[in-house]
């Protein structure tokens, strides 16, 4: 997603992932007490450069994040809740309650960021095989889509809204990339079948054991979609016109455990969840070649999954997926670090 404040976040329910895996100009929010439906942001420990946003609730295990302007949204894999916060403000609250509209789990999330279009929030539903579309301001349900596959055959992991308004959804289990045309979203379609945009069968993008297609973004010149394969660390380019699938040439580098991604101008940020870092990739405008130019990490990172760019900072979800079934540190958090 090539814009200043978006995410592609990417993603998976924690146990499945493990098997395969604020604006710099904004004031730092002050600490405040966490409540049942609202939590706060605080300045991180001296060993960290991050500002920390606390998520309300217990057992959240967050995954996806997206942002438009200074508003950000975070998903919960545990019950499908979606939280909303404002960069520079201490309060993060429940925007969409868990379980509503059959949303029992939520993974990747994206939001439109175009003054000429309505503000839509799109949520990939993991093993449910569903995608939900909401009004990003009111929280009203707009449309729903499904691939009709069983929970053992699909995992809708991440979603990216392209510049033309169409949405693209990755599936970590089934070798397909889905497209949701913008006109179907506007029409308020309910339980519509997901359209397979590209089947990866017979292409260089070979599915194997573990998690496959994960994070997705639109490239800088909007000619293609870029998808990371978690299990191999390979990056793939899907041409939006010809639908040709090719591997991005990273000069021999790989992005193992690649999860959520964010495109900010010509810099691609790739979260490598198990490795606790974000890789910076200088990607050419056409998305065919790139080079890993650096890494970002912070003491506050705790199995990071997805990232959203807001001005000169990155909002990073700390999923603690490695603590599922154990003792996670609560509250769950989002870190805001410099790019």
What are these regions (language model features)?
Residues 41-59, 290-294, 337-338:
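A short helix->beta-strand "capping" segment at the edge of beta-propeller domains
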Residues 12-16, 21-46:
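Short, low-complexity, disordered segments immediately C-terminal to signal peptides
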Residues 56-71, 100-122, 148-167, 202-224, ...:
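Beta-rich, blade/repeat-based domains predominating
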Residues 73-79, 114, 118-127, 167-173, ...:
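Conserved beta-strand positions in repeat-built beta-propeller and related beta-rich domains
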Residues 133-196:
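Hydrophobic alpha-helical segments and helix pairs
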Residues 1-10:
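Bacterial N-terminal signal peptides that target proteins for export
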Residues 306-339:
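Blade-level signature of beta-propeller repeat domains, shared across WD40, Kelch, NHL, RCC1
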Residues 86-90, 135-140, 181-185, 239-244, ...:
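Short loop/turn segments that connect beta-strands within beta-propeller blades
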């Amino acid at each position: 997603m090539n814009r200043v404040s978006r995410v592609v976040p990417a993603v998976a329910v924690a146990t499945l992932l493990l098997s395969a895996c604020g604006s710099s100009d904004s004031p730092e929010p002050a600490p405040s007490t966490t409540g049942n439906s609202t939590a706060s942001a605080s300045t991180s420990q001296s060993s960290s450069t991050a500002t920390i946003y606390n998520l309300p609730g217990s057992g959240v295990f967050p995954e996806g994040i997206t942002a438009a302007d200074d508003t950000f949204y975070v998903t919960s894999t545990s019950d499908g809740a979606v939280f909303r916060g404002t960069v520079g403000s201490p309060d993060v609250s429940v925007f969409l309650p868990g379980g509503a509209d059959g949303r029992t789990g939520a993974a990747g999330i994206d939001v439109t960021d175009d003054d000429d279009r309505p503000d839509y929030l799109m949520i990939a539903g993991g093993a449910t095989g569903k995608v939900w579309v909401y009004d990003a301001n009111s929280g009203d349900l707009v449309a729903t889509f499904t691939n009709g596959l069983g929970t053992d055959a699909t995992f809708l992991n991440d979603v990216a809204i392209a510049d033309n308004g169409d949405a693209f959804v990755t599936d970590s289990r089934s070798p397909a990339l889905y497209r949701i045309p913008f006109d179907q979203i506007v029409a308020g379609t309910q339980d519509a079948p997901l359209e397979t945009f590209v089947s990866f069968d017979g292409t260089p993008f070979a599915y194997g054991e573990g998690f496959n297609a994960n994070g997705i973004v639109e490239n800088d010149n909007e000619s293609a979609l870029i998808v990371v394969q978690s299990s191999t660390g390979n990056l793939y380019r899907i041409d939006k016109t010809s639908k040709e699938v090719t591997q991005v040439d990273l000069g021999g580098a790989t992005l193992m455990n690649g999860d959520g991604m964010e495109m900010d101008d010509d810099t691609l940020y790739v979260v490598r969840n198990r490795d606790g870092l974000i890789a910076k990739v200088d990607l050419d405008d056409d998305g065919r070649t790139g080079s890993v130019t650096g890494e970002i990490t912070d003491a506050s990172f705790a199995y990071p999954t997805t990232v959203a760019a807001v001005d000169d900072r990155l909002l990073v979800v700390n999923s603690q997926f490695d603590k599922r079934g154990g003792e996670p540190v609560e509250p769950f958090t989002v870190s805001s670090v410099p790019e």
